[in-house]
Amino acid sequence: FIEIKSANPLVAPLIQPNYLSTEIDVQEILEGTRLLRKLAKSPPLAKIIESEIHPGQNVQTDDELMAYIRETAGTVYHPVSTCKMGPNASSDVVDNQLRVHGLYGLRVVDASIFPTVTSGNTNAPTIMVGEKAADIILSAHGEKNI
């Protein structure tokens, strides 16, 4: 969740991403960890990987892996997908014109409208969102009126 802490726009919001808070999150990270271990033991990589450093071969069970992951997991500080786009005001934040449901004159134009995080840096897709938003706003108000 995101919580606005102040009316001052310079005060950062509280962002609680709820990492690993659902069973599907846990299962996906465990599956990914197992896949990485399997790849590391494949003939091409086994030639150059002497041993697993972290979490180490002594960490094997799902509970042990999750304990390690919960203790060491971090973020790359590219929060996205916090303002779902859709037509339903009760479950979505913005419509397809980037307007916030229920608030006149407010649009969200940033990475928070992404449906999922991109596999690379968020800068270029965020610029594309901005460009699309500019087109939407110009179209809505008429280019000559802006």
Q: Can you name each region flagged by the protein language model?
A:
Residues F1-P125, A133-I146:
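FAD-dependent oxidoreductase catalytic-site/capping-region signature
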